[in-house]
Amino acid sequence: MYVVTPPQRSGFGSDCDLRVYQTWKGSNIFCLQGRFIFGPDVRSLGLTISLIVAPVTIFCIFVASKLMDDFSDSWGVSIILVAVVFTIYDLILLMLTSGRDPGIIPRNSHPPEPEVVDGNTGSGTSQTPRLPRVKEVEVNGKVFKVKYCDTCMLYRPPRCSHCSICNNCVERFDHHCPWVGQCIAQRNYRFFFMFVFSTTLLCVYVFAFCCVYIKKIKESEDISILKAMLKTPASIALILYTFISTFFVGGLTCFHLYLISTNQTTYENFRYSYDRHSNPHNKGVVDNFKEIFFSPIPPSKNNFRAMVPRENPMPSRSVVGGFMSPNMGKANDDIEMGRKGVWAMAEHGDGKDGNNNERFHVNDNELNELSPDMGNIVNGDEQINRPNNHPRNANWEMSPEVMALSARRA
């Protein structure tokens, strides 16, 4: 009998050479060694950047540069300068929204201690601890119901929800935005709204000066508005593009202005039907805006660059014959993902006396379901009953009846 040790991974020299982001169990993507955290759909961020930069580039080349001839030097340069600065500001807000911790709550490595017992209290009946699915907590004199998250193994705070895309519980979860590739929540909602609002203003700015350029062509050449539009196809394309974009991002801005004024999140707005009196988070319009834009942003609960000890593998079992159950790893994954892992581990014996008796650790109830006598024959702590006068190392031979029956079936 010997102990099977798990294989060691190469490339790691010490027990504390991993950082938090390297052992992260969520679906996030990290950049620059954990300095930036994105959602798993971060590739869409490139599309969003191109949808902002490309129209502004076309505007500066084909519209703003031509307007410099119609305005004085200072005004002509300022048209391009404002567009460039506004675009840079918009991209900074985009990165502040997408590349920071939105308010992820660190998951527990073990579930909390159960507080209730499920089961009969009669004699001979085992009591099974079970966590309540919902608990009531009091925050600032108000009672909230919090739910237990099987994946993160914690009770979610009020206004917290589990993002199925990032696989994290996030504080004051608003929604997961695929355009920025990140959850929108407590720590980046302010920047998200400013990004959407500034994008709306940028679209209006480009739309307005494209119209001004068409008007300048019409007045300078004394032609109809239609002919003036045909002389600058770039302006027509930008007008159509910015009009459609303003319809979407402008509508999103108005929607979030309503949410801020009532202190709601997108998740709460679609899931619950609050009125003015039932919303426990509504503090009034002024205080609601102060909470979003002027309250300090809480620090992150995660230090993604902190050094952590490497997680120890499953404790080595005393195994005979060098066999470990292949389901052990699957059971760990089931526990981490919040699923109930059901598996049985088998230990094979290889004694020195030549007997190869397999011993299975299974549930007695499962054995009784197979056969009432199975639980008495196969048990982790019992051996097959032998006659008292039977030698331990004797060979057990099949009776002639059994041999005949097996030969007939063959």
Curated annotation (Swiss-Prot):
Active-site residues, record numbering mapped to chain: 177 (s-palmitoyl cysteine intermediate)
Segments forming domain DHHC: 147-197
A GO CC annotation given for this chain: plasma membrane
TM region(s), chain numbering: 45-65, 76-96, 191-211, 235-255
Predominant location category: membrane
Subcellular location, record wording: Cell membrane
Modified residues (Phosphoserine): 325
EC identifiers of the protein: 2.3.1.225
Homology family: Belongs to the DHHC palmitoyltransferase family.
Name by which UniProt lists this protein: Probable protein S-acyltransferase 6
Organism of derivation: Arabidopsis thaliana
Lineage: Eukaryota, Viridiplantae, Streptophyta, Embryophyta, Tracheophyta
Gene label: PAT06
